[in-house]
Amino acid sequence: AEQCIALHPDLVVVAVNKASIAAVSTEWLARGFAVLSETPAALEEDALRALWQLHRQGAKLQVAEQYWLYPTLAKRLAAVRSGALGTPQFARLSVAHGYHAVSLARLFLNAGQQPVRVTGRSWTEKIIETDSRWGAVHNGALVEKTLQQHTLEFAGGGTAFLDFNGVQYHSYLRSTHTSVQGERGEVFDDTLRCLDAAGEPVCRQLTPLPDPLAAAAAQAGLNEDETAIACFLDRMQGYLAGGAEVYPLADALQDAYL
């Protein structure tokens, strides 16, 4: 810690085990440093409230919720926000777990801080392991994983169906999917179906957003998660200079709470 303090960093990135994130973030905030913490910001409601209080007192804290910056998800979110679907009513997401999925659901449905009713259940699923963080798996091992399904019913009328098994992060046998529907159309993965200005149905493929940093990251061989984190860190420069939050802390805390 003393070596880090002596360097006078512009930013302290807290990437520790989940149980320690809130405490370590608080420690560095108390020292007067800006902090970018891993997700989730905290595991307990009291810790979430304490972090919010520090924020209100002027502490500079951001939480690295990165999924909305995934190039594939960013273009889908942009299509929804363009108004092409009308008002987004339903989101069916099978792309991430827990707080990441909640973040995406709230963004796709433009739900903000609306009250929400959450229901769900889980099942045990058997599947042959084919991939991992460290590379392909070829031993044919049959493993048990947990499939979780949750429904989020927002007070404003939007509903999200979350369906995810952790194996989907690294598997050749399970894919991920995104579907968002409004009265004028639907985004299903990278396909947009909607009505044009004349009321005629159109169908087109979504293309990546013009983001030079994301393009450079992809060209350098970074995967989507690495690209999203790089984009988040780049945007932190503006926040540290007094600009807007990269991802509102209120949203990051709400994601973790739900």
What does each of the following model-derived ranges do?
Residues 4-9, 84-85:
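Glycine-rich phosphate-binding loop signature in dinucleotide/nucleotide-binding domains
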Residues 15, 38, 163-164, 182:
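Short, well-ordered coil/turn residues at beta-beta hairpins
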Residues 9-13, 17-18, 22-68:
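Beta-strand-loop-alpha-helix segment that lines the small-molecule cofactor/substrate pocket
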Residues 3, 11-14, 59-60, 231-258:
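C-terminal helix-rich "cap/oligomerization" subdomain common to oxidoreductases
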